[in-house]
């Protein structure tokens, strides 16, 4: 008698993309201990939490140290005081009304975008953009919705919607019927966006085909242009077909504090084997109350402070700081004659590698010759080959230094 494993895990690539990036970086640092490496790969932030957030955080911790104000287990879905602030500030300004029980507070959009697939049948046909945030793909592989990875880097059973310079990084509708479509805009990794009309095409498809859109809007706060939707629910009919994911990680520096939320409107539904309509809100609530104990009270208080008058001002300054970095990266690389995308409504810059160099070769060149770490585009899918992602989350000083180093390279 032996314990059998979930063999779907064996279908995955040998290591998670960012683990391999970190491994190569660590190996280089070990061999070059004096090298000053500038990290512009993984999307971690460098600015500290805003003062108003810290003040609220500390106040909530003090409450936890007092018997009269101590709080134990909180509601798995999150406290209403935070959900109310989210609705008031993130949705109502765009004409979207929600109830608090449609907002689920969590410890990360990565967790939610990975876990949401649990409420769907394994037989559903999945579509992802290519390149893509790898969590969408890997979690469906783990669940058993795909076959093996083919020689072209694509998994059997997944539908890939190519995004490249030729189509302006706007994915075409799937040629075959699909049940679930993952979209991320502003996009990770390409930094590009969809207009209202372009997003409406997908919403209309989902309505017609009774499909579900899983819409990752983790980078909404970086939107600068007018014709870019801030939430998918600005599109007519989207409440019937879309689940939206948001995060405080990049918006407010919560990468180490952990807080996010998922919106599951009561209108959005799936179907059981008998064809009966089932609210996805109920299923997600059941999943969360079973597997998740909720985000800590101090963290939720800190997140709510993001929406205070002082918090909004402080957060805007931080976001503007990162977007200035993005501007520096984009303009510097364009001056070198490189093709550069993103960086306008997003902290991500998507760079075409010079001289048809492959992604990992360009990664190694920047690491070895400029001591700058990016993320190889091929790690995000076959259509990412020949690109490299840089992030705007380092300091302005380091960002300028990195661009200066790269400008001295001979491509």
Curated annotation (Swiss-Prot):
Positions bound to pyridoxal 5'-phosphate: 73, 109-110, 133, 188, 219, 247-249, 258, 293
A molecular-function term among this protein's GO annotations: L,L-diaminopimelate aminotransferase activity
Modified residue annotations for N6-(pyridoxal phosphate)lysine: 250
Lineage: superkingdom: Archaea
Biological process annotations from GO: lysine biosynthetic process via diaminopimelate, diaminopimelate-aminotransferase pathway
Enzyme Commission identifier(s): 2.6.1.83
Similarity-based family: Belongs to the class-I pyridoxal-phosphate-dependent aminotransferase family. LL-diaminopimelate aminotransferase subfamily.
Pathway: Amino-acid biosynthesis; L-lysine biosynthesis via DAP pathway; LL-2,6-diaminopimelate from (S)-tetrahydrodipicolinate (aminotransferase route): step 1/1
One Pfam family it belongs to: Aminotran_1_2
Protein's name according to its UniProt entry: LL-diaminopimelate aminotransferase
SUPFAM superfamilies per record: PLP-dependent transferases
